[in-house]
Each structure stands twice: as C-alpha cells, then as structure tokens.
C-alpha cells in the first residue's frame, strides 16, 4: 500500500510540474489544506522567526490551528460585507506594533467567492510588507 501511495504521489508531482513548468520536487501533496498550511507556516517560522499571520476574523478553527501550532500568532482582520474576505482598506489602516512582524497573510475565498480586485490588492499589500501570501 505504501509503495502504491508513493508511486501515486510521484506521478502526481510529475503531472503538476509538467502543467505548471515547475519541478516535481516543488510539490508537496497533502491530504487536507490545513496540513499544507501547517507545512507553510512551519517553514515561515523556521526562516523568519516569531511573528504574526494576518487572517480574517470570519473563519474556522481549522484555518487558525496551523498558525498557532507553528508558533506564530494569528492577527485578525475585519472582513468586507460584500466579499466576506479580508477588508483590504481596513488592513491598510490597521495599527501594527513597532516590533510586530507580519510574516504571512491568509487569503480565504469564503464560500468559494473570489473578489479579484480585493485579491490583487491583498497580494500587493503582502508584497509591500514582505509577507508570504497563503491562498
């Protein structure tokens, strides 16, 4: 069974790499998104140290647990009533402590709704802050 699973993951990595022009070694298939988030946040903390992850207030514990388990701090942002996602305007004016370092931002598409303008703005803000965008 383990050999079959390993072979399946190898084939999946090859297919994903082929479709995206990347390397198979770049892909880390996981069973659930929260497991992938855990891998990402562990890596962020190992490279950047202590800090926070900006996430939206309207979410579930399975989206916050990987942040906490990795040793980072969740920093909650207000959501927009029209998108149910992070309200970028409020994040832009959110006061940060002088020693607070935002290492990542979570872009959650609540109910599968994607607001392209807000997504672009949040991605740009993450870049300006030097934060990893986790979508």
Whereabouts are the PLM-identified features?
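Short, well-ordered alpha-helical microsegments
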Residues: 36-38, 61-64, 115-119
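Active-site phosphate-binding strand-loop segment of PLP-dependent enzymes
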Residues: 83-135
């Amino acid at each position: 069974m383990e050999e079959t699973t390993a072979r399946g993951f190898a084939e999946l990595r090859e297919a994903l790499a082929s479709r995206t022009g990347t390397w198979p070694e770049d892909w880390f298939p996981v069973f659930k998104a929260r497991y992938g988030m855990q891998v990402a946040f562990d890596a962020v903390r190992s490279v950047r140290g202590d800090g926070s992850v900006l996430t939206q207030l309207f979410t579930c514990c399975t989206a916050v647990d990987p942040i906490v388990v990795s040793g980072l701090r969740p920093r909650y942002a207000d959501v927009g009533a029209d998108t149910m996602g992070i309200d970028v305007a409020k994040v832009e004016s959110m006061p940060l402590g002088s020693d607070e370092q935002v290492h990542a931002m979570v872009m959650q598409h609540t109910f599968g709704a994607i607001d392209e303008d807000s997504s672009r703005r949040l991605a740009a803000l993450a870049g300006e802050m030097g934060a990893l965008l986790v979508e």
